Amino acid sequence: MAQEKMKLGFKSLPSSTTADGNILRRVNSAPLINGLGFNSQVLQADMLRIRTNRTTFRNRRSLLLPPPPFHGSISRLHQIKQEEAMDLINRETMSEWKLQSEIQISHSWEEGLKLVKWHFNINQKRFSKAQPTCFLLILPNCQKIMCIYFQLLLMETTAMLDLLVIRQLKSALSQTLLCHLLILVLICSSRQTFN
């Protein structure tokens, strides 16, 4: 009974309104030719051929051309994430390297200060000219030429300090601070000399 009502409710429209009505309902972008309707047999054969050609063209095109922008944006996003991860790894590596360098420098300073304190504990009476070698042990990375320069400079400095300052410095802390000052003076003077 529902089929009979559907058949009765269907009314055919004149061909001019069919063509105009089909223009509004069309999803295909091909224009109508001279008012022919969408259901005419002339257009149906051409449309089937065009549709099959378009699908095969799309398949061939997908093999030749790069993927659509959506896939490209995913790969670009993946690439950016990898670059950020590498940057993060590089930053962590650099901070770890700086930390290890600082630890190594602090250990070398502690060892040098222990050597200076030990040297001052042995020789508390005088600061003689033979002692500049202990300062050279604090700076183990110097080249041979720099060590000779340091030794000569320290001998002159200690000879002068022996007369002026060392007799007035009674505590080991004062002597240690003076050693720090001498080391800084030597490092600064060596940088100016070799640059």
Swiss-Prot record:
Name of the gene encoding the protein in the UniProt record: PABIR3
Similarity remark: Belongs to the FAM122 family.
GO molecular function, a single term: protein serine/threonine phosphatase inhibitor activity
Residue ranges crossing the lipid bilayer per the database entry: none
InterPro entries: PBIR1/2/3 (IPR026716)
Phylogenetic lineage: Eukaryota, Metazoa, Chordata, Craniata, Vertebrata
Protein's name according to its UniProt entry: PABIR family member 1
